[in-house]
């Protein structure tokens, strides 16, 4: 992304009017991306990425000269220690080409939408205790912007009891030991050792729930509950209301009902404005603009989409013209990053373990490991117990290039061991040219609901857990990021066969009417 900016600004392809009127720090950005040491030329980017300098130039020109144009990015941007700077560069690309909040460009959220759910109850419920949030003193940007304790430092607190012991836990639709945590066995051991009580609200009993929860509250599935959903995180927002369509099983409740019941029990005085869950939903999710029961009748409601909101005061809470930043402009030179102790301009930081940064490891671990691309059948660790989905992807897959397979004697469909200095797991090889010959791509979030769920097996989640190879405590200066996409590893064939018995999956999870 820095190299794309380099091409655009050196060739004068930026939207000069938008840059002059609505951005802050363009000259500083130009100086940074063209700097011989801190900048990023297409040739330098080619050495890092393997993408040719000519192709980088072609892509930059194509984007800059397409009016309008939009950029979409996904989770992978966050999954490295340099992720905040990658995001900064992508936003800079949108800004310098004038593709922000214009028809066909990248649309910003409307401040007048008024969603109440972010931070609901934080001031009343947490108050001065917020100053004791784990990690706040070291990473205030992380803790203040996403309003929770720093994840890696929470692991440290669980293990050491410092700055204070962690004794209570709650999961809500979270399967951290199978899906989201680096070094998951380390998290398992810390949680089991430290927590005196833990409960979860979930539709299924996961390895995380089995290992650490004293109480499991059944969560109503989508068809068993009322609810609302939004698109685009509030930008160009559409609202969908849905009403319960199926009879509930047992004592299942929705998340809203559970929060409402627990909240009223703990502090009834905070809930006096809400006579029932519908009123709570109307305020929290619909900002009192719509009544929930009216929304539930509709298939979809599209809010008015207003462009050029920076020109009419719809991006800022104070109603002033401009963008929601200290300068009122899109900050190419970020005063907010500067406030939190980071460089206000984008920079490239090589991953901690890479061919360039740790060449001494290449003899033992010659392949770049990337993880977590989403298969069609699953969303993270969900749907492993749905036989129709599991048929599409019955086993954990690692994709390797044909040249690598030939060199290592790996056959298509053979089980392999993947390992590095942090841990190991086993997955099933898929030979494909979709991955580079220096790269290994492994699926994540695997567990096997058809297996024994008791300790120590826990549905086999640690056996094919690629996060075993991912370390904690590798994040950026402001505390964000993790190295899920950029590590080193070795891979070798094994004689064992761990193929899923699909007949067992069907028998255990077939529909009641089958």
Describe the function of each predicted region.
Residues 218-224, 237-248:
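Short beta-alpha connecting loops at secondary-structure transitions
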Residues 19, 31, 35, 46-49, ...:
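Hydrophobic alpha-helical scaffolding
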Residues 15-17, 56, 70-71, 99-109, ...:
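Acidic/polar loop patches that form or flank catalytic/metal-binding clefts of enzymes
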Residues 1-66:
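Long, well-ordered, tryptophan-enriched scaffold segments
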Residues 5-12, 37, 53, 60-67, ...:
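Structural signal for hydrophobic packing residues in well-ordered secondary-structure cores
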Residues 245, 249, 253-299, 386-399, ...:
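Long, contiguous, secondary-structure-rich segments that constitute the structural scaffold
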Residues 2, 47, 92-212, 220-230, ...:
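Extended redox/cofactor-interaction regions of prokaryotic respiratory oxidoreductases
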Residues 35-41, 65-73, 166-170, 234-244:
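Short acidic (Asp/Glu) and glycine-rich catalytic loops that position anionic groups and cofactors
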């Amino acid at each position: 992304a820095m190299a794309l900016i380099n091409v655009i600004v050196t060739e004068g392809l930026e939207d000069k009017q938008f840059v002059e009127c609505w951005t802050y720090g363009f000259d500083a950005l130009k100086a940074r991306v063209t700097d011989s040491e801190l900048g990023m030329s297409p040739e330098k980017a080619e050495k890092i990425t393997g993408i040719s300098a000519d192709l980088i130039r072609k892509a930059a020109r194509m984007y800059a000269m397409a009016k309008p144009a939009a950029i979409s990015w996904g989770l992978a941007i966050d999954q490295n220690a340099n992720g905040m700077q990658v995001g900064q560069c992508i936003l800079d690309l949108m800004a310098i080409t004038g593709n922000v909040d214009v028809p066909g460009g990248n649309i910003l959220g409307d401040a007048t939408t008024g969603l109440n759910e972010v931070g609901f109850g934080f001031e009343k419920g947490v108050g001065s205790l917020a100053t004791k949030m784990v990690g706040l003193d070291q990473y205030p940007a992380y803790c203040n912007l996403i309003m929770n304790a720093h994840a890696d430092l929470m692991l440290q607190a669980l293990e050491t009891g410092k700055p204070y012991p962690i004794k209570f836990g709650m999961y809500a639709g979270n399967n951290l030991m199978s899906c989201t945590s680096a070094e998951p066995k380390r998290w398992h051991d810390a949680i089991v050792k430290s927590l005196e009580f833990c409960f979860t609200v979930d539709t299924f009993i996961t390895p995380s729930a089995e290992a650490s929860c004293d109480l499991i509250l059944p969560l109503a599935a989508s068809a068993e509950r009322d609810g609302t959903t939004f698109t685009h995180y509030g930008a160009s927002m559409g609202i969908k209301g849905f009403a319960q369509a199926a009879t509930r099983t047992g004592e299942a409740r929705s998340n809203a009902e559970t929060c409402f019941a627990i909240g009223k029990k703990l502090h009834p005085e905070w809930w006096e404005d809400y006579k029932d869950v519908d009123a709570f939903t109307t305020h929290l999710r619909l900002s009192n603009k719509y009544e929930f029961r009216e929304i539930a009748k509709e298939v979809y409601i599209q809010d008015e989409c207003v462009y050029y909101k920076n020109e009419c005061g719809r991006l800022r809470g104070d109603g002033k013209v401009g963008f929601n930043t200290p300068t009122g402009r899109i900050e190419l030179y970020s005063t907010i990053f500067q406030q939190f102790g980071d460089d206000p301009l984008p920079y490239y930081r090589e991953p901690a373990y890479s061919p360039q940064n740790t060449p001494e490891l290449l003899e033992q671990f010659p392949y770049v490991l990337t993880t977590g691309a989403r298969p069609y059948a699953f969303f993270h660790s969900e749907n492993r117990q749905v036989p129709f989905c599991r048929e599409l992807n019955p086993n954990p897959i690692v994709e390797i290039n044909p040249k690598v397979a030939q060199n290592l004697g790996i056959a298509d469909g053979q089980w392999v061991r993947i390992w590095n200095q942090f841990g190991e797991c086993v997955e099933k090889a898929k030979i494909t040219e979709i991955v580079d010959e220096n790269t290994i791509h492994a699926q994540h979030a695997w567990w096997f609901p058809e297996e024994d769920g008791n300790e120590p097996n826990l549905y086999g989640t640690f056996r094919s857990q690629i996060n075993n190879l991912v370390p904690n405590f590798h994040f950026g200066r402001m505390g964000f990021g993790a190295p899920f996409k950029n590590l080193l590893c070795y891979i070798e064939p094994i004689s064992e066969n761990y193929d899923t018995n699909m007949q067992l999956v069907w028998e255990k999870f077939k529909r009641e009417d089958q």
